[in-house]
Amino acid sequence: MILRRITEHVKAQNWTAIWIQFVLLVSGVFLGIQVANWKDERWLACSRRILDHLDAREPYSEDLDICFGTCFWSSKVQFSTTAYEQLKNRGLDLISNKALLTEISRIHEYMFELVATENEQWDWQLLGSSVYPRHVERFRKYFPDSWMPLEDEYAKPVDYHALLGDTTVKNILAEIISLKGFSIATKKATALEIDALLSGIDREVSELRGR
């Protein structure tokens, strides 16, 4: 519905309406990034906790099971670029505010691509090639009686003593920590740029309404 309205407003060059509809779509991406980072920060904390626990050779604790079950998880942001493609097809040069045009293009063609390829693609490649096979070998997933759908999963080590000396698992955890930290930082930078863009659009709409 929103995309159809954008198309109609672009044809009519009704820029106030275009910007308002565009804000609705970009705001959805902004919120998606915030939620994804909230999840990733929790899972990053789990990975760090497990690695510190294993490096210190501390005894097994059932409190770690939720971390064993979720440490390798990774969130994925759904980026909507259809509104941007609509503007491109109709001619981005129709946008008179060149500062906004530059920022819109940068966010859609660079920042979104960076998050999707450099971050999420690496996460999924590592998950399929190394993390999941090792996790299935070293851990057994379970769900407590109190578990509810959409809550974090749990897992117990098959042999905790062997896990203490498993360098591969520790190296995988270190890699997860590194990649997830980079992913979180990139998504935060993207969110800041989106926030600045939304402020710029708000100013543009105010000026258009004042004419």
Role assignments for model-derived ranges:
Residues 1-16, 30, 37-211:
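Long, hydrophobic alpha-helical segments that serve as membrane-spanning/inserting helices
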Residues 19-33:
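Hydrophobic membrane-insertion alpha-helices, especially the h-region
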